[in-house]
Every structure is written in structure tokens, then in C-alpha cells.
């Protein structure tokens, strides 16, 4: 069965009112989280960032550092693999995937027209002012997960960013730039699951004052495709 035949991604009229289809398989919902939910999620991120298995700066396989910092839940990700321990940091067991993210993942799928997805890995990225993330594809989840078009959920908190969603073939154009503000939701899967994407810039000082957050947090949920040994 081809990816197009899979009933994973529903047609855009089944998504929540206010949802914007950036391209087939990529849905953006502005102001998806209310003020109280954003405050609660930022507070949770601050707890998850504490050691052990806390926030760290990842490095590429060549040793070059990311400009973002991150903490993982459920499964620890580092280029380009998953582990139950923070192998590139303090070696501690990764924190459990929490119920709050299970609930948000289910709601995100329902509101964007995707089928329910068994999310089991989260990456919380922190963008200090000036941080960015180069164009890349999420490919560590394995052929089955990617081939099914299992969606990736991203919740934006704090400063507004430019999120660049490219194509499945190359880092070059065509691409779409979306201004993700605090509380916005972006989900991409189905035919967009293999798209290159990144964050070429953030806009310092644009986040809501009530979050007391200097910079931006992105909370990204994935189906890892991992099986316990």
C-alpha cells in the first residue's frame, strides 16, 4: 500500500476551524494553547530541564555544537539514534514520557485531522536569543514510521520564530516560511513527513511577558519506532 493510500492524514476540512494547511500533510493552528496552558507547559519544561538527564547542548557527529539546547523525554535522541540513557551527556536514564504530552499529542492529532499516534519520544529545544536550527529531516525513527507518514507535533512557546518547511527532495527551494508565535501548533506528517525543515531565526523579545521566558521553547513529539531490546 502506498503512502498516499494510507488513511493516516485526513482531508483539511476535518481539521479544527482556524487550521491552515501549509502544504499537503502540514497543518498550522495559531493560538492553539491558551495562556494558562502555556504557563503550565513552560513550568513543566523547566522541571524536565533539571538534572539528571537534563538539558544539554547536543553535538553533531563531527563534534560541532548545536546553537540550541535540548532535553529528551521517553527516548533520548542524539545524532542520529535513540537510547534509553543520555549517552552523549551524563549517562542517566532518560525521563519518562509524561501524561501531559500524551494528552497534548492526542489533541493535536484530533485537531489537525491525523489519526491517533502512539507518541513516545519528546525533544524540548531551547532557543536562546540568536539561536537557530538548520534545515534537516527527521529520519532516526526508521523506515516503517517514516513510510507511514507518522506525524511530528511541534508546540511553540515564547519568542516568535520563522519556521521553514521545505520539500522532500532537497534543502533548496521550494519552501514555506511560517511565523510561529507562542501557543501555536504545527503538525506535519503523511506526504510532508520527510520534508526538510528548520528555524532560520527567532525574534527576541516577542514572547508573552507572563511566561518569563527569555527565548523560545519548542516541544516536539514523535513516534520513535524503537523496540525495547
Predicted regions: what they are:
Residues 1-229:
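Non-heme Fe(II) oxygenase metal-center motifs and adjacent flexible, charged/small-residue loops
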